[in-house]
């Protein structure tokens, strides 16, 4: 089973587009899109990971 991951190397970004492509984080919180999720990953110092694509 391959780990689900997203490349957050280009983040953080100051502004996120309002695209609706939800991701579920390891904190059981739904993030609206990759940008919002990756900003949160950076803020968490890498402790936040992707649980799965789609809403939690």
Curated annotation (Swiss-Prot):
Its main location: secreted. It holds the Pfam family Kazal_1. Glycans are attached at residue 45. The record marks 18-19 as: Reactive bond 3. InterPro entries: Bifunctional_prot_inhibitor (IPR051597), Kazal_dom (IPR002350), Kazal_dom_sf (IPR036058). Avian ovomucoid consists of three homologous, tandem Kazal family inhibitory domains. This is Ovomucoid. It comes from Gallus varius.
């Amino acid at each position: 089973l391959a780990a689900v991951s997203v490349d957050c190397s280009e983040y953080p970004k100051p502004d996120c587009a309002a695209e609706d492509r939800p991701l579920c984080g390891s904190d059981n919180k739904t993030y609206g899109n990759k940008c919002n999720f990756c900003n949160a990953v950076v803020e968490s110092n890498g402790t936040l990971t992707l649980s799965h694509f789609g809403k939690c």
